[in-house]
Amino acid sequence: MASLYDNEAKIKQAIIMLQKIVNDTSVPRNIRRAATDAIRNLQDSSLSPAVRAANAIGILEEISQDPNMPTHTRISIWNVVSMLETVKD
């Protein structure tokens, strides 16, 4: 059960990091929208933590290729993806 709590803690930390991106007005709107979608996926309690993380990773990896993304935002997204990749069932 400790693993479940670790996974939930990682997901909560990822949500906090993504909320910072959503609230940053220097980030283009489409990237903020993708971060909001990733947060929504992470908060979907009907799915297991690993599935929620995988869904969010898919959204974030797709948007991380956007050439309009500020460098600091890209690094934050990579950090979130790295954290979510460690979430396992």
Curated annotation (Swiss-Prot):
Superkingdom of source: Archaea
Record NCBIfam families: PRK04330.1 (NF003319)
Family matches, as InterPro entries: Ta0600-like_sf (IPR023130), UPF0147 (IPR005354)
Family: Belongs to the UPF0147 family.
Protein name: UPF0147 protein STK_04605
